[in-house]
From Swiss-Prot:
NAD(+) binds at residues 52-53, 130, 176-178, 196, 201, 242-243, 263-267, 273-274, 322, 492. The keyword Isomerase does not apply. NCBIfam families: hutU, PRK05414.1. It catalyses: 4-imidazolone-5-propanoate = trans-urocanate + H2O. GO terms for biological process: L-histidine catabolic process to glutamate and formamide; L-histidine catabolic process to glutamate and formate. Its main location: cytoplasm. Binds 1 NAD(+) per subunit. Pathway: Amino-acid degradation; L-histidine degradation into L-glutamate; N-formimidoyl-L-glutamate from L-histidine: step 2/3. This is Urocanate hydratase.
Length: 556
């Protein structure tokens, strides 16, 4: 019997202002853990899988139940320790210490590979936390929509003079992360053709308004794209097909998309990528009997897909890796020029990271969408001179369906995060909001991750693989008074390829919270500016000087 599987479970976080725990500092992590497993949020909630292949919220259902039990009794001077999804200890700390400290999927570097991790996972000794799955701050596909939107806007500026109309994107994957591509692409003005092997995922994205149409053949999908481009109104199409098959077929037909990328779960060849010619059922059976054969076949198909991406790039498509490590998998399978197309961070996002700008997100613990709409208005009020941000907030309200507890994401940086958070805290204090707000972020942020094939690819000083930075980030956020802090390994790109940290803080309207959010939400993005200034980026150096950061080795 698999203790991780229970189809009878249907988890819905409490709404409203009534507490189940002893304070909002423990109620918040409880609600957010539960929200990660909401049926409209998680990919496979019955298996505790939130997104990203096997990214889980808790190690098994016994651990989940115990975490909830402990959070309900936890005092405001105690800290719960969670080791790979398992609650292992409660310790007396102090009121400004985190209520929960989480470490997920971390392995000593020599053993940091999927083979060793999968053995531990089978024995119930480890859990893959992805990024926000095991750190309890996943907000559904919205969590990556704006970052994807910002990337596609940058693609349009760099390659098409800022005009995406009449252009289309080819991609793969409509899971929890990949599902953002279709909506983000149409928001940026592109049409999008996304290949997905799991029809339930296409249907899920249709239901949550992330995909406009479904197709079952390439010809049908291309007709939809062509009609949309002719009409000038972008469309997103979920095509039920294997990405490797479709990418290669387009090369064969001589059809070149304007933009090519991919967001299948290629980071996990065992659980995340369906080999060409295989059915979902066949893959599920083979995972039980011959894991090595599954991995070999998956990586062979990834090689086909990446070769097609290279061929499409040579034919004129703007081609980018969207952070799932598919280039690495293809490289290991013989595609020696797999890295000839860039990752999205060095190509389009790094200047934002240099100013500590990244995926700032918040959630209304009340469950009331009005609380989010009021905070949207507050963001516009406090940042009046950023029409791009205002446009994003307007589009988000109009086009993004909330999944689980209402939430919002917008990319802001060092200059704005702390003051926005303090304004939200004041709104809770004066009753404008009906319950506290939690503020967090993706681990994909400027100072919280070391990932040489994604966020820290091609650092100008060669420090791509130095992982001191996310460790320092987690330590500083703990010292600063975050409500919960997490330190993970392997998110986004898989075992052995990343280390990263997460932070969440509660705005409960108290003076103590105002002080904590002021520290945490200044220090957290400041570590990103510090990291990039240390690597030599002038934008980061200038930002550090403008904001008065004390960086001892930064020369005047």
């Amino acid at each position: 019997m698999d203790k991780r599987h229970d189809p009878s479970r249907r988890i819905i976080a409490p709404h409203g202002s009534q507490l189940s725990c002893k304070s909002w500092l423990t109620e918040a992590p409880m609600r957010m853990l539960m929200n990660n497993l909401h049926p409209d949020v998680a990919e496979r909630p019955e298996d505790l899988v939130v997104y990203g292949g096997i990214g889980r919220a808790a190690r098994d259902w016994d651990c989940y139940d115990k975490i909830i039990e402990v959070l309900k009794r936890l005092e405001d001077d105690e800290t719960l320790m969670v080791q790979s999804g398992k609650p292992v200890g409660v310790f007396r700390t102090h009121a400004d210490a985190p209520r929960v400290l989480i470490a997920n999927s971390n392995l000593v570097p020599h053993w940091a590979n999927w083979e060793h991790f999968n053995e531990l996972d089978k024995q119930g000794l480890a859990m893959y936390g992805q990024m926000t799955a095991g750190s309890w701050i996943y907000i559904g596909t919205q969590g990556i929509v704006q970052g994807t939107y910002e990337t596609f806007v940058a693609v349009a500026k760099q390659h098409f003079g800022g005009v995406a109309a009449g252009k289309w994107i080819l991609t793969g994957g409509l899971g929890g992360m990949g599902g953002a591509q279709t909506l983000a692409g149409t928001m940026a003005g592109f049409s999008v053709l996304a290949c997905e092997v799991d029809e339930t995922r296409i249907d899920f994205r249709l239901r949550t308004r992330y995909v406009d149409k479904k197709a079952t053949s390439l010809d049908e999908a291309l007709a939809m794209i062509n009609d949309a481009n002719a009409s000038g109104k972008p469309v997103s199409v979920g095509l039920l097909a294997n990405a490797a098959d479709i990418f290669a077929e387009l090369v064969k037909r001589g059809i070149t998309p304007d933009v090519v990328t991919d967001q299948t779960s290629a980071h996990d060849p065992l659980n995340g990528y369906l080999p060409q010619g295989w059915t979902m059922a066949q893959a599920a059976d083979m995972r039980k009997t011959d894991e090595a054969a599954v991995v070999k076949a998956a990586k062979a198909s990834m090689a086909v897909q990446v070769q097609a991406m290279l061929d499409l790039q040579a034919a004129g498509a703007a081609t980018l890796d969207y952070g799932n490590n598919i280039r690495q998998m293809a490289f290991e399978t013989g595609v020696k020029n797999a890295f000839d197309f860039p990752g999205f961070v060095p190509a389009y996002i790094r200047p934002l990271f240099c100013e500590g700008i990244g995926p700032f997100r918040w959630v209304a613990l009340s469950g009331d969408p009005e609380d989010i709409y009021k905070t949207d208005a507050k963001v516009k009020e406090l940042i009046p001179d950023n029409p791009h941000l205002h446009n994003w907030l307007d589009m988000a309200r109009e086009r993004i369906a909330f999944q689980g507890l209402p939430a919002r994401i917008c990319w802001v940086g060092l200059k704005d995060r702390a003051r926005l958070a303090q304004a939200f805290n004041e709104m809770v204090k004066n009753g404008e909001l009906s319950a506290p707000i939690v503020i967090g972020r993706d681990h994909l942020d400027s100072g919280s991750v070391a990932s040489p094939n994604r966020e820290t690819e091609s650092m100008m000083d060669g420090s791509d693989a130095v992982s001191d930075w996310p460790l320092l980030n987690a330590l500083l956020n703990t010292a600063s008074g975050a409500t919960w802090v997490s330190l993970h390994h392997g998110g986004g790109v898989g075992m052995g390829f990343s280390q990263h940290s997460g932070v969440v803080i509660v705005c409960d309207g108290t003076e103590a919270a105002a002080k904590r959010v002021g520290r945490v939400l200044w220090n957290d993005p400041a570590t990103g500016v510090m990291r990039h200034a240390d690597a030599g980026y002038e934008i980061a150096k200038n930002c550090a000087k403008e904001q008065g950061l004390d960086l001892p080795m930064l020369k005047d």
